[in-house]
Design a protein with these regions (language model features):
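Active-site beta3 strand of CheY-like receiver
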Residues: 50-56
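Receiver (REC) domain active-site loop signature in two-component systems and cognate sites
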Residues: 61
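Conserved acidic segment of CheY-like receiver
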Residues: 4-25
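Acidic catalytic/metal-coordinating carboxylates
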Residues: 39-42, 65-68
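Alpha4 helix (beta4-alpha4-beta5 surface) of REC/receiver domains from two-component response regulators
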Residues: 68, 89-106, 110
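C-terminal output helix
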Residues: 92, 110-123
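Active-site T/S-Asp motif of two-component receiver
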Residues: 10, 57-58
Length: 131
């Protein structure tokens, strides 16, 4: 029996990165990108209807950045894993994001294999559902 695929919402202002992450994650047997958003406002609008298991969230975005969106995403998706995926490599920023409710912080320079491995570590245990 094939395990349930983790539903992923990709939030980043760079359209090419959203598309790339969608393609890269969709080819994996255990992930399915269910939606994308270009900023925190769009992410909040889509969060409840898409009900993702994982939110891959950029920090630096126009309109509403990742840190601003984080509390609202956490409120709407209490069981989802929120992963900051950012080009910023500052330890203080990572600590701030984790303190604000993020489950993990991954730098954008990370290889695809490392990103997928980290997302697999965050998978929900069998039998536990976000609905």
């Amino acid at each position: 029996m094939r395990p349930r695929r983790e539903r992923v919402l990709v939030v980043d202002d760079a359209a090419n990165l959203r598309e790339l992450l969608t393609v890269l994650l969709d080819v994996e047997d255990d992930f399915e990108v269910v939606g994308t958003a270009a900023d925190g406002v769009q992410a909040l609008e889509k969060a409840e209807s898409l009900n993702p298991d994982i939110v891959l969230l950029d920090l630096a975005m126009p309109v509403m950045d990742g840190l601003q969106a984080l509390p609202g995403l956490r409120e709407r998706l209490p069981l989802a894993r929120i992963v900051i995926f950012s080009g910023f490599e500052h330890e203080a920023l990572a600590r701030e994001a984790l303190a604000a409710g993020a489950d993990a912080y991954i730098e954008k320079g990370t290889s695809v294999m490392q990103l997928v491995a980290r997302l697999r570590q965050l998978r929900r245990p069998a039998g536990e559902d976000s609905a």
